């Protein structure tokens, strides 16, 4: 093979690589945010939750579910879901977590669950802050709110939790940053300079002083367990973990998990 042919092959491979980089750069948000994926448990809602709409600062009405506990409590669980699927796919969590003396607000992000808009990092932060304001308008104080983040929702949880003293924080399958997560899935791409939405959770979690529970499956093939462990190590006390080896990406809501949740809720004194 002569030198000119070698150069042509190299040039062709480089062109293909650059096309891949360009494609991923242009499509990155459609690869990250997956509102139409239906890959979670299918379960009917067993509590009387109300369909509500929370308006964010971009005047988008966010479809949400609000369960008001019959005990007339101020304790409220605010849930931020992950990057895939509608709020219906989280009904099983509401069914389980309604056992505690708390209200539950589960919001859906812009473009999810039939909402308008396009998801971005700043957009999701705005959606979360709008949900907090909605609760405050119902005379529910920050100190009575427990933030629950699932996967992508953990990054949003950490962003808002570093700026206020919430009653508690629950993180399910947290990642250190979107840069690290993207490197795991696309090790051949320069994701550090490509990503628009970086979600730098590892730089923010040290600013949280609320009690925190981190749950992560050791067999997670989407967000590696090492990221959850790193986030736990970076978190301030008081902190607790539920690390389980049987599950994949999201932890199973079984007796073992609920026992750990019971212990965390005792720390938060929710049922008193």
PLM regions and their residue ranges:
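Membrane-embedded segments
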Residues: 57-134, 150, 154-155, 161
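Short alpha-helix in the alpha/beta-hydrolase fold that links the catalytic acid
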Residues: 93, 201, 210, 224-233
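Alpha/beta-hydrolase fold nucleophile elbow
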Residues: 139-151
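Hydrolase active-site cap/lid region
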Residues: 154-210
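Acidic catalytic loop of the alpha/beta-hydrolase fold
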Residues: 219-223, 249-251
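C-terminal catalytic histidine-bearing segment of alpha/beta-hydrolase fold enzymes
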Residues: 230-233, 237-272
